[in-house]
Curated annotation (Swiss-Prot):
Organism, as annotated: Rattus norvegicus (Rat)
Function comment: Serine/threonine-protein kinase that plays a key role in polarization of neurons and axonogenesis, cell cycle progress and insulin secretion. Phosphorylates CDK16, CDC25C, MAPT/TAU, PAK1 and WEE1. Following phosphorylation and activation by STK11/LKB1, acts as a key regulator of polarization of cortical neurons, probably by mediating phosphorylation of microtubule-associated proteins such as MAPT/TAU at 'Thr-523' and 'Ser-573'.
Protein name: Serine/threonine-protein kinase BRSK2
Residue ranges, compositional bias (Low complexity): 411-429
Family: Belongs to the protein kinase superfamily. CAMK Ser/Thr protein kinase family. SNF1 subfamily.
Gene name as annotated: Brsk2
Length: 735
C-alpha cells in the first residue's frame, strides 16, 4: 500500500493500488481488510482485499492463491468477480467487484424474515451459482448469509472463496472448515466428506434462516451447538409452506447419502413454483475445446502455476503427465478452462497511473509471454516507448511519454485476472496484442513519422499516424472485435449509471473546462448480435454548447425519436437517442458525442470539435458502449474509424441510409436529415476560410438562437409514437 501527499501537518494522504485510490474500509475478512477503491480516471468502484503477507502463515497464503485460481474458473452472474491482482513485498491486493447492497445477513436482520416469494428468489440465485461451481468441481464450504452479498438490484453475489476447494472426481475432502451453525454433521465429526453434500446442507440452513429469521441450530455453548447439529433435530415453524418444509427436511438431512442433490432441488415443486417469478439469470455456457499438448513447451506457465495453487494438484510431475496424456481427463479440462480465461481477459500493464513516488509500489500481476490457442508462442509485449518507435504503432503523446519515463517499466509476474479498465483511448493508447488504429487528439511528438493524404476536403493537411502493418490483411470482423475490445476492455467493469447534467454543468460547456478527454462506458459486453453503424463530423464553431444545440436542433423534427442530453465531464456534450423498436433487432440507440479535437480556442477564435454518433441495435441487455469521441486534426469531414464503414464519409452515409431505407424504417428519415446537415456543413466549409465559423443549420428549430439557448439540462419530451420497424437489411461486408 502506498501513500502520496505532503508530509506537512493536516495534509491529506491518498493511498493507491495501481490506478485505484483507497477509500473507506468496507469490512474485515479472515485474511485481511477490504477497502473501497475508486479508479482515478473512470471513477469505477471496486472492493480491494488487502492481505498482509508478513502476518500470515505460508498455509494461509496458499489458500489466498487458491482463492485467486478458483475465482478465475468461475464466471457467473451471481458470483463475485475478480478483476486484478496486485502485490508488493508486504501486501497482496485482490481487486474484486464492488456491490453496494451489503450482506444478506444485514438485510435479513433488518427485515426479520422474508416472504416465501422473496426467499425463493434469493434461494434460486444461490442454487444457480452453486450448481455452476459444482459443475466445475469447486465446493465453497463456507456458505452463510455473511458471505452472500447484494448488488444495487438486490441480486445475490456469492463471495469469500477462501475456504473453497477443488474436488476432483469421486475423491472426498478431509479439512473441517466453515461456520458451526452452517456446517454439516460429517464435517463436525471430522470425517471425510463430499463437499457438494456439505454445500447443500449449508443452503438448507440459509433457506431456513430466510424464511424464519432464526437458525435451525443455535446455542450459546459451542459444545451444545455441535451436538444439536450432529443430531439434526430442529423445530419447523407452522408458517413455512408445506412444500418448502419437505424441501428443508431433504436438505437438512443428517445422512449424507439421503440428502438431496442440487439436481433434485432444482426439480422440487417449491423451487419451480411461482410461475410469474423471473428465473435466475443463467450464464453463457463455456465450451472449451480440449486438445492434445505435444510437449512441455506447449504448456502455459501461468496456467500451470494457477493449477498448482488449487491444492489438489500438488504432485507437479503427475500433473504434467496428465496434461500430456492423449486421453481427456479432469486436469486437462481445468487447464483449458484457465487458459480460455487468460486468452479472453489478458492482463496488461497499467497505464495512466497518477504521478506519485513510492519505494515499493503495488505491481500488477501481468501475463508472461504465453502460447495462443494454436500452440504458437506469442511475441513478448513491448512497452509503449518501443511500440511507438519500432513497430509502427500509434505514436505516444508527449504527456504519456513523460509519465512513462517517470514511472518506469512495471514488473511482470504470475497472471492475474484482468479488469480491462483503461482511460480514454484518445489520450493514451492501450497496449494490446493487436495494435489499435486509434489516433491521439494531442500534438504529435517530434520525430514521429506522419503522413499527409493527397487530398483533404478542407484543403488543409491532415497528419495521421501511420497504420500498423500487422492488421492489414486481417478480415474486418477480426479487426472490429479487436477495436471493440480495446475500447471496452474487460467486461468485468462495474456499470455506471448515466447522469443528466445540471444547469451549471451545461452552462460550463466551454473549451476552458479541461482539455482532457474522459472515457465513456455505457453498457455491458460487446456481443455479436449488436448491429451498428458509425459516423463522425468535425465542426468549426466557437463554443461546444453551440455544437450541442445545433445537433439537437437537427434531431428535434425527426419522428419516432426520443432523446436526452448527457454530459460527462463538462467539456463534452452528448445525446442519447432512442428509436422505434425493430422486429428482429430490438430497440435502436444512437449515441452522439462531441469533444475537442484540438487545443481549446482562444477568445474570439474558432475551435475544432469532433462529433461522432453510433447507431446500435440489439436486445436491451446487449447494449454496448460505442459512443466514443473521434479525434481528427482536420477541419473537414473525416472517414470513420470503424473498418466496416465506407472510407468516404458521404459514401458511408449513403450506405447507412440505403441499408435502413430498405427496411422502411422511420430512422431512415433521421439519416436523411443528418446527411443533409453533412452536405450543408461540407459546402459551408469549402466556401469559408478555416478560421471562419461554419454556417448554422437551417434544419433545426433552434435556428440562430442555438448558441444562446436555454441550459442544456432540459430533457426534451419523448415521442409517443413508437412504430414497428421492418426486418433489417443484411450487413454489407467490406474487406
Amino acid at each position: 500500500m502506498t501513500s502520496t501527499g505532503k508530509d506537512g501537518g493536516g495534509a491529506q494522504h491518498a493511498q493507491y493500488v495501481g490506478p485505484y485510490r483507497l477509500e473507506k474500509t468496507l469490512g474485515k475478512g479472515q485474511t485481511g481488510l477490504v477497502k473501497l477503491g475508486i479508479h482515478c480516471v473512470t471513477c469505477q468502484k471496486v472492493a480491494i482485499k488487502i492481505v498482509n503477507r508478513e502476518k500470515l502463515s505460508e498455509s494461509v497464503l496458499m489458500k489466498v492463491e487458491r482463492e485467486i485460481a478458483i475465482l478465475k474458473l468461475i464466471e457467473h452472474p451471481h458470483v463475485l468477480k475478480l478483476h486484478d491482482v496486485y502485490e508488493n513485498k508486504k501486501y497482496l491486493y485482490l481487486v474484486l467487484e464492488h456491490v453496494s447492497g451489503g450482506e444478506l445477513f444485514d438485510y435479513l436482520v433488518k427485515k426479520g424474515r422474508l416472504t416465501p416469494k422473496e426467499a425463493r428468489k434469493f434461494f434460486r440465485q444461490i442454487i444457480s451459482a452453486l450448481d455452476f461451481c459444482h459443475s466445475h468441481s469447486i465446493c465453497h464450504r463456507d456458505l452463510k448469509p455473511e458471505n452472500l452479498l447484494l448488488d444495487e438490484r438486490n441480486n445475490i453475489r456469492i463471495a469469500d472463496f477462501g475456504m473453497a476447494s477443488l474436488q476432483v472426481g469421486d475423491s472426498l475432502l478431509e479439512t473441517s472448515c466453515g461456520s458451526p451453525h452452517y456446517a454439516c454433521p460429517e464435517v463436525i465429526r471430522g470425517e471425510k466428506y463430499d463437499g457438494r453434500k456439505a454445500d447443500v446442507w449449508s443452503c438448507g440452513v440459509i433457506l431456513f434462516a430466510l424464511l424464519v429469521g432464526a437458525l435451525p441450530f443455535d446455542d450459546d455453548n459451542l459444545r451444545q451447538l455441535l451436538e444439536k447439529v450432529k443430531r439434526g433435530v430442529f423445530h419447523m415453524p407452522h408458517f413455512i409452506p408445506p412444500d418448502c418444509q419437505s424441501l428443508l427436511r431433504g436438505m437438512i438431512e443428517v445422512d449424507a447419502a439421503r440428502r438431496l442433490t442440487l439436481e433434485h432441488i432444482q426439480k422440487h415443486i417449491w423451487y419451480i413454483g411461482g410461475k410469474n417469478e423471473p428465473e435466475p439469470e443463467q450464464p453463457i455456457p463455456r465450451k472449451v475445446q480440449i486438445r492434445s499438448l505435444p510437449s512441455l513447451e506447449d504448456i502455459d506457465p501461468d496456467v500451470l502455476d494457477s493449477m498448482h495453487s488449487l491444492g489438489c494438484f500438488r504432485d507437479r510431475n503427475k500433473l504434467l503427465q496428465d496434461l500430456l496424456s492423449e486421453e481427456e481427463n479432469q486436469e486437462k479440462m481445468i487447464y483449458f478452462l484457465l487458459l480460455d480465461r487468460k486468452e479472453r481477459y489478458p492482463s496488461h500493464e497499467d497505464e495512466d497511473l497518477p504521478p506519485r513516488n513510492e519505494i515499493d509500489p503495488p505491481r500488477k500481476r501481468v501475463d508472461s509471454p504465453m502460447l495462443n490457442r494454436h500452440g504458437k508462442r506469442r511475441p513478448e509485449r513491448k512497452s509503449m516507448e518501443v511500440l511507438s518507435v519500432t513497430d509502427g504503432g500509434s505514436p505516444v503523446p508527449a504527456r504519456r511519454a513523460i509519465e512513462m519515463a517517470q514511472h518506469g517499466q512495471r514488473s511482470r509476474s504470475i497472471s492475474g485476472a484482468s479488469s480491462g479498465l483503461s482511460t480514454s483511448p484518445l489520450s493514451s493508447p492501450r497496449v494490446t496484442p493487436h495494435p489499435s488504429p486509434r489516433g491521439s487528439p494531442l500534438p504529435t511528438p517530434k520525430g514521429t513519422p506522419v503522413h499527409t493524404p493527397k487530398e483533404s476536403p478542407a484543403g488543409t493537411p491532415n497528419p495521421t499516424p501511420p497504420s500498423s502493418p500487422s492488421v492489414g490483411g486481417v478480415p474486418w470482423r477480426t479487426r472490429l472485435n479487436s477495436i471493440k475490445n480495446s475500447f471496452l476492455g474487460s467486461p468485468r467493469f462495474h456499470r455506471r449509471k448515466l447522469q443528466v447534467p445540471t444547469p451549471e454543468e451545461m452552462s460550463n460547456l466551454t473549451p476552458e473546462s479541461s482539455p482532457e478527454l474522459g472515457h465513456l462506458q455505457l453498457f455491458g459486453n460487446p456481443v455479436s448480435k449488436v448491429r451498428s453503424v458509425a459516423m463522425e463530423l468535425v465542426i468549426l464553431v466557437q463554443t461546444l454548447a453551440y455544437t450541442s444545440f445545433r445537433l439537437l436542433g437537427t434531431f428535434l423534427p425527426v419522428r419516432y425519436l426520443r432523446h436526452s442530453v448527457l454530459s460527462r465531464p463538462p467539456e463534452r456534450a452528448r445525446l442519447v437517442l432512442r428509436g422505434a423498436p425493430c422486429t428482429h433487432m430490438g430497440p435502436v440507440w444512437n449515441m452522439v458525442g462531441m469533444a475537442y479535437t484540438q487545443n481549446p480556442p482562444i477568445m474570439g477564435e474558432t475551435g475544432v470539435y469532433g462529433s461522432q454518433w453510433v447507431m446500435s441495435s440489439a436486445p436491451s441487455k446487449h447494449y454496448t458502449s460505442l459512443g466514443l469521441s473521434v479525434p481528427s486534426p482536420s477541419c473537414s469531414l473525416s472517414p470513420s474509424l470503424f473498418p466496416f464503414c465506407a472510407p468516404d464519409t458521404t459514401n458511408c452515409m449513403e450506405v447507412m441510409t440505403g441499408r435502413l431505407s430498405k427496411c422502411g424504417t422511420p430512422l431512415s428519415n433521421f439519416f436523411d436529415v443528418i446527411k443533409q446537415l453533412f452536405s450543408d456543413e461540407k459546402n459551408g466549409q469549402a466556401a469559408q476560410a478555416p478560421s471562419t465559423p461554419a454556417k448554422r443549420s437551417a434544419h433545426g428549430p433552434l435556428g440562430d438562437s442555438a448558441a444562446a439557448g436555454p441550459g442544456g439540462d432540459t430533457e426534451y419530451p419523448m415521442g409517443k409514437d413508437m412504430a414497428k420497424m421492418g426486418p433489417p437489411a443484411a450487413r454489407r461486408e467490406q474487406p
